[in-house]
From Swiss-Prot:
GO terms for cellular component: membrane; plasma membrane. It comes from the Bacteria. Keywords: Cell inner membrane, Cell membrane, Cytosine metabolism, Membrane, Transmembrane, Transmembrane helix, Transport. GO terms for biological process: cytosine metabolic process; cytosine transport; proton transmembrane transport. This is Cytosine permease. InterPro entries: CodB (IPR030191), Pur-cyt_permease (IPR001248). Required for cytosine transport into the cell. GO terms for molecular function: cytosine transmembrane transporter activity. Belongs to the purine-cytosine permease (2.A.39) family. It comes from Escherichia coli (strain K12). The chain crosses the membrane at residues 20-39, 52-71, 101-120, 128-147, 153-172, 193-212, 222-242, 258-277, 301-320, 322-341, 359-378, 381-400. Its main location: membrane. It is found in: Cell inner membrane.
């Protein structure tokens, strides 16, 4: 097995852990993404002013709680999402969530590259293929340097996006008559509140399932909860507000489009580039960790390979794969639910990653994911929340029953090895 400073095959040592501020910037860099603005635009034009804020705050609170669980587990153990999955899915069984998580992140990376290149190409007249090649290369080179590079990039990007985007929103709202005029807007096609909540939670629950990949570098597990809450409850909410304000004022959800319409071309390119760069690098970093769990290769090398694939296929992914990626992403929330459920039941096993005896494949975990997907699809309520709870509850109920002998045997062996 190849080792690298991404610690893709074992826990992050205390000497490599980082402070809460650095991780907060990294996680905000993940959640500052154009797709959340687009969803915010949909909500802003489909809900009243007060219902919009209620949906955004409740939805992102639920998202924050979910990611906080995963962040706590990641920081407590120092393990990636994929190594955590070994405890519940089995060593080879964890390849399934790793393939699902890693594959979707490569896909979204390619989509993100195209999301930058296409509007910039239209605004400047530059060749879109050239923009894709250059931006994809820059993003791929950055991720090669691991969590430290992600931190530096996010420290630059997060304040820039917040300040420039905030200024643009202020101009847009003032241009339509101020906050009172914004409050007075009546939705032409009202959106059901439960659908709105599902859109908010669903906007980032796929990437949120990978929270442990980043927060495992935290020195304190309790502070990891704070990091996840700030990123998803505050950071994601800000993107929704940007999108809603832009859509209400100028009919454009992406803040970079609003800025171009305002004549702020260079700031728009900066905001769009940094916005996508930070999220894409996090996606590429996480994809490398996923495929490292399957292959045992260096996650650095795999991230670079994934970046090249995503860049080459960017336009095709953008034009043909978004619907498929969205479908695949619906299968991801139950994976997080199963990981959380197993940790709650067997947290002492997680203290000894190197010596813990694990199953090859735990079919109960895979069944629980399938039941979680079914719960999300068929049960009334908030789809991604139902999927997480369906996966977690199915695992909590079925695993002790169907794996009683196996669990007892592993617990006995581990108890003897600790003694």
């Amino acid at each position: 097995m190849s080792q690298d400073n991404n610690f893709s095959q074992g826990p992050v040592p205390q000497s490599a852990r980082k402070g809460v501020l650095a991780l907060t910037f990294v996680m905000l860099g993940l959640t500052f993404f154009s797709a959340s603005m687009w969803t915010g635009g949909t909500l802003g034009t489909g809900l009243s002013y007060h219902d919009f804020f209620l949906a955004v705050l409740i939805g992102n609170l639920l998202l924050g709680i979910y990611t906080s669980f995963l962040g706590y587990i990641g920081a407590k153990t120092g393990l990636t999402t994929h190594l955590l999955a070994r405890f519940s899915f089995g060593v080879k069984g964890s390849w399934l969530p790793s393939l699902l998580l890693g594959g979707t992140q490569v896909g979204w990376f390619g989509v993100g590259v195209a999301m930058f290149a296409i509007p910039v190409g239209k605004a400047t007249g530059l060749d879109i293929n050239l923009l894709i090649a250059v931006s994809g290369l820059l993003m791929t080179v950055t991720v090669f340097f691991g969590i430290s590079a992600l931190t530096v990039l996010s420290v630059i990007a997060v304040p820039a996006i917040a300040c420039l985007g905030g200024y643009s929103v202020w101009l847009a709202v003032n241009g339509m008559g101020g906050l009172d005029a914004l409050k007075a807007v009546v939705p032409a096609q009202p959106l059901d509140f439960n659908v709105a909540l599902a859109l908010v939670v669903g906007s980032f629950i796929s990437a949120g399932t990978l929270t442990a990949d980043f927060v495992r570098f935290g020195r304190n597990a309790k502070l990891a909860v704070l990091v996840a809450m700030v990123a998803f409850f505050l950071g994601n909410s800000l993107m929704f507000i940007f999108g809603a304000a832009g859509a209400a004022a100028l009919g454009m959800a992406d803040i970079s489009d609003v800025m171009i319409a305002q004549g702020l071309l260079l700031p728009a390119i900066v905001v769009l580039g940094l916005n996508i760069w930070t999220t894409n690098d996090n996606a590429l970093y996480a994809s490398g960790l996923g495929f490292a769990n399957i292959t045992g290769m260096s996650s650095k090398t795999l991230s670079v390979i994934n970046g090249i694939i995503g860049t080459v296929c960017a336009l095709w992914l953008y034009n043909n794969f978004v619907g498929w990626l969205t479908f695949l992403s619906a299968a991801i929330p139950p994976v997080g639910g199963v990981i959380i459920a197993d940790y709650l039941m067997n947290r002492r096993r997680y203290e000894h990653f190197a010596t813990t005896r694990m199953m090859s494949v735990n079919w109960v975990a895979i069944l629980a994911v399938a039941l979680g997907i079914a719960a999300g699809h068929w049960l009334p309520g908030i789809v991604p929340v139902n999927a997480v709870l369906g996966g977690a509850l199915s695992y909590l109920i079925l695993n002790p029953i169907l794996n009683r002998k196996t669990t007892a045997a592993m617990t006995h062996v581990e108890a003897n090895s600790v003694e």
